[in-house]
């Protein structure tokens, strides 16, 4: 019943909109200068009630501190938090190239991801630290990465990142959020990978060679008219009925929210975060990049490869509230 005494009709789109599941806002909010990624998995004797309590406290703390938080739940943990499980939610399995190069997309599937972004590195640190301490004896940190905004959304290679995203928030939501009425409605599938760049090898190439590898110009990210079959764009810019045929409509099905990182030992790269309303397009692009089904391998993998890879699901706000 509405506040005015009228019973809501779920078949009425105007009324249904009032109760549609809400995607986690931080997926689409403007990213802060500082990012913090923490991956965890349960330890022996983990208490589910404690984990749920820490998740609630973390959400409240981030809201209080002005931190954008995305919570990603792995395939093993999600059924313990909710019965609303999206279709075709798989673990990240290592993908190995078949061309004898030894290149692979490494799978390191974990159970829980915190992604925090804000202008305040100190607040990010304190908030994630408190959550980790509260989870001791229940979940262990598998890996963490601190990233940042580099220039005008640049990758460490000097190329603009995220050019291929759907244009506008409405288009991004249409691509990234499970539609109302489907299992997992309001949620989003995540591909989280830490890519490691070989910048020394990359910088030995001319700009023209680099542009052929990406399939875009370096200064302004313009699509090259002639795409080499090994270009990155040829593997990830999927189009209706084709892969990189510019005459066909683009399959605007992925929202990228990636940032670069630099570790104290000189390791640099990109923390790749992609959101999608189904998981299949995320898996499809990875298989294409590594030529796993007999195609030409993406030459970008000669200069960058993932040290980790996990698939998660970011449940709706309502699902998290009920967990």
Predicted features, each with a name:
Residues 19-323:
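Long, histidine/aromatic-enriched segments associated with O2/redox biology
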Residues 8-19:
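Short, Lys/Arg-enriched N-terminal segments with co-localized hydrophobic residues
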């Amino acid at each position: 019943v509405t506040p005015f005494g009228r019973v809501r009709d779920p078949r009425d789109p105007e009324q249904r909109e009032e109760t549609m599941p809400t995607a986690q806002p931080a997926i689409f909010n403007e990213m802060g200068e500082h990012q913090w990624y923490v991956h965890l998995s349960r330890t022996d004797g983990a208490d589910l009630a404690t984990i749920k309590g820490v998740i609630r406290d973390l959400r409240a703390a981030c809201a209080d501190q002005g931190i954008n938080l995305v919570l990603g739940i792995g395939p093993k943990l999600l059924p313990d938090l909710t019965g609303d499980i999206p279709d075709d939610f798989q673990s990240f399995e290592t993908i190995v190239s078949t061309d004898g190069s030894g290149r692979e997309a490494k799978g390191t599937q974990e159970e829980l991801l915190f992604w925090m972004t804000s202008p305040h590195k100190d607040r990010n640190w304190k908030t994630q630290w408190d959550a980790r301490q509260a989870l001791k004896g229940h979940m262990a940190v598998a890996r963490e990465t601190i990233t940042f905004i580099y220039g005008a959304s640049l990758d460490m290679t000097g190329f603009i990142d995220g050019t291929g995203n759907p244009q506008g928030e409405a288009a991004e939501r249409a691509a990234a959020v499970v539609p109302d009425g489907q299992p997992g409605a309001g949620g989003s599938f995540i591909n989280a990978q830490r890519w490691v760049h070989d910048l020394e090898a990359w910088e030995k190439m001319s700009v023209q060679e680099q542009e052929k590898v990406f399939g875009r110009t370096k200064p302004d990210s313009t699509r090259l008219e002639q795409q080499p079959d090994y270009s990155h764009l040829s593997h990830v810019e999927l189009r209706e009925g084709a892969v990189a045929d510019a005459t066909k409509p683009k399959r605007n099905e992925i929202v990228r929210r990636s940032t670069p990182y630099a570790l104290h030992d000189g390791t640099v790269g990109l923390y790749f975060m992609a959101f999608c309303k189904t998981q299949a397009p995320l898996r499809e692009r990875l298989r294409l990049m590594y030529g796993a089904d007999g195609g030409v391998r993406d030459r970008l993998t000669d200069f960058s490869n993932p040290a980790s890879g996990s698939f998660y699901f970011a449940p709706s706000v309502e699902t998290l509230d009920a967990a």
